[in-house]
Amino acid sequence: DKDSYKVSGGLHGVGVSCVNALSTDMKVTVYSHGKVHQQEYKKGIPQYDVKEIGESEIHGTKVQFLPDDSIFTSSEYKYETIANRLRELSFLNKGIRITLQDHREVDADGKSEIETFHSEGGLREFVEYVDSTRERLIPRPLYMESDKGPIPVEVAMLYNTSYSENVFSYVNNINTVEGGTHVAGFRRALTRTLKSYADKSGMLEKLKMEVTGDDFREGLTAVISVKVQEPQFEGQTKTKLGNSDVMGAVDQVVGEMLNTYLEENPKEAKIIVQKVILAAQARNAARKAREMVQRKNVLSGSGLPGKLADCSESDPEKCEIYLVEGDSAGGSAKQGRDRKYHAILPLRGKILNVEKAQEHRIYENDEIKNMITALGVSFGTEEGEKVLNLTKLRYHKVIIMTDADIDGSHIRTLILTFFFRYMRALIDGGHVYIAQPPLYLVKRGKEEKYCWTEEQREVAVKELAKDGKEDSVGIQRY
């Protein structure tokens, strides 16, 4: 409805209709043109026609609803989820002020938690917020904005010393997590403009390899926001934009403004191009290291790691591999496994933090090489070097089993980070599991109870000491 809004994230009113249908009670109050109008609903049915209930100089709409507990087994709202979304909106709409108040809990003074989100810098501050824990390569965010054409475009970007790309894209304030034409336009302009500048500067002359789009985006954090009057999303969840004209609009704005920035800031431009060259060299070294790992596997027959205690079953769907912390844990795991279905691979110490390492270093790490070899997967397909080939996956359940302490948690995080960055298909395919070790073994005589929380431990002690003799209950902490 262009008479009400120039652009809108909602397209058909499905959202409010669904909220109404799934609520026992809903009340909508509209403040507009000096008047206040209201309508109430129960189980989706209007209780009366829209009526005027007063006058007011404020503008806006207030929606109050109560989820239907006959439909939802749980309707607890996560404060952090709501806060993150409102913070996001304050960055995307600079200058506005959004207040979040949680009335569910109050302090000793009877006050509830309240938080205000406000940003004068908009996307500049958004990028700085996202990159707050990373080391910058350029001092300030590169900011591009244009509302001259039919599609307003706003982009902010920073380069950092990491080896990953983080691009956040929005259409009419909706987070398009799968990207779309606006992201494609941004990437196309970024690659073309940076390559053109690098070629003219002569910095690529000594590089004896082709530079790819991935090289230009290594260490990049960017936020893209476009306003589209008639957005075409792929799917009802609105996670990917499909408007073809948006690609050209973003491409033009980013291409022109990025080129101007590079010409006016030669020092920063040189730093960015040097980062691109390092990325290309690391990618080439990683390709050679990856090929070497896979070639060794082929030449050495099965090539399975020496510490792997494999299972006898040949059907991958029935097989499980446990990645365990250290040789001693590996020994315990071997004693408790079913040899037919369970394989055990002990990992020595903490594996490499792939988030802070160049790719070729990853393939040189023994523990990571052992994991790759044991899983049987190969990297690189016709679609691209980073695509994981799962056709040779030897175990359809990959279970991370570390200790219940801080070190165990850290090792688990490092393994998950490796899978997320380099074996994402394992996670997306539902192959990765985490074994949750117990914190306590509570024992009295031949009776044993494993406990995962303090509360469970207390209950177990009481159950085993019904005669009141708690001193006779042994507690072992893992």
From Swiss-Prot:
Heterotetramer, composed of two GyrA and two GyrB chains. In the heterotetramer, GyrA contains the active site tyrosine that forms a transient covalent intermediate with DNA, while GyrB binds cofactors and catalyzes ATP hydrolysis. A type II topoisomerase that negatively supercoils closed circular double-stranded (ds) DNA in an ATP-dependent manner to modulate DNA topology and maintain chromosomes in an underwound state. Negative supercoiling favors strand separation, and DNA replication, transcription, recombination and repair, all of which involve strand separation. Also able to catalyze the interconversion of other topological isomers of dsDNA rings, including catenanes and knotted rings. Type II topoisomerases break and join 2 DNA strands simultaneously in an ATP-dependent manner. Mg(2+) 2 binds at D403, D405. Belongs to the type II topoisomerase GyrB family. Its EC number is 5.6.2.2. One of its GO terms (molecular function) is DNA topoisomerase type II (double strand cut, ATP-hydrolyzing) activity. GO terms for cellular component: cytoplasm. It is found in: Cytoplasm. Its cofactor is Mg(2+); Mn(2+); Ca(2+). PANTHER family: DNA GYRASE SUBUNIT B, MITOCHONDRIAL, DNA GYRASE/TOPOISOMERASE SUBUNIT B. Keywords: ATP-binding, Cytoplasm, DNA-binding, Isomerase, Magnesium, Metal-binding, Nucleotide-binding, Topoisomerase. Few gyrases are as efficient as E.coli at forming negative supercoils. Not all organisms have 2 type II topoisomerases; in organisms with a single type II topoisomerase this enzyme also has to decatenate newly replicated chromosomes. SMART domains: TOP2c. The keyword Ribosomal protein does not apply. The record marks K350, N353 as: Interaction with DNA. Pfam families: DNA_gyraseB (PF00204), Toprim (PF01751). This is DNA gyrase subunit B. The keyword Cytoplasm applies. Residues 319-438 form the Toprim domain. It catalyses: ATP-dependent breakage, passage and rejoining of double-stranded DNA. Binds two Mg(2+) per subunit. The magnesium ions form salt bridges with both the protein and the DNA. Can also accept other divalent metal cations, such as Mn(2+) or Ca(2+). Mg(2+) 1 binds at E325, D403. One of its GO terms (biological process) is DNA topological change.
